[in-house]
C-alpha cells in the first residue's frame, strides 16, 4: 500500500483504470475494499482466468475488456491519454455497445459509469477520433475475428462477441 501512495496521482489513476475492469470480471464491489485488498482481488481474478486458459484461446480474452477501443486510441496516437485512462474509456464504450446490442440494460450501463466515476476516470472518446478512423482501427485489431470483435458485458457476464455490425459502433 505504501508503494502505491508514492505514485504521482495520474500514474495511480492509470492503474485503477485496470482495476475498474475487474469489477465486471467477477470482482463485484471492489471499490468497497481498501486499495491493497482491491489489488489482491484483481491479481487473484487474473490468475484464475489465466490458469483456466493458459493459451488465450477462450475465456482469457475477457482480460481485454475495454481494450479494443483503448488499443485503437493508442494506435491513433496524439492523445494525452495513458493506457489505464484509455481502458476506462474503452470500458464505458463497450458498455454502450453492449446496451445497443441488447446485452445489458441502462442500469448496467449506469453501474459501469458509477465504477469509472468512483475512480475519477475519463469516459469519453477523444473528439478528434472520427467514427471512420475508429472503424478502420477496429478492423485491424489483432483480436478481430469475422469483422469487428469486442469483449462485451452481457447476461452471461463479460465475453467475446464477434462479427459486430459496424453500424452499431457509430
Predicted regions and their residues:
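Alpha-helical transmembrane segments of multipass membrane proteins
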Residues: 45-49, 72, 97
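Active-site His/Glu-centered metal-binding helix of metallohydrolases
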Residues: 65, 69-73
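Catalytic Zn2+-binding segment of zinc metalloproteases
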Residues: 72-81
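An active-site-proximal "capping" alpha-helix that borders the catalytic cofactor pocket
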Residues: 84-99
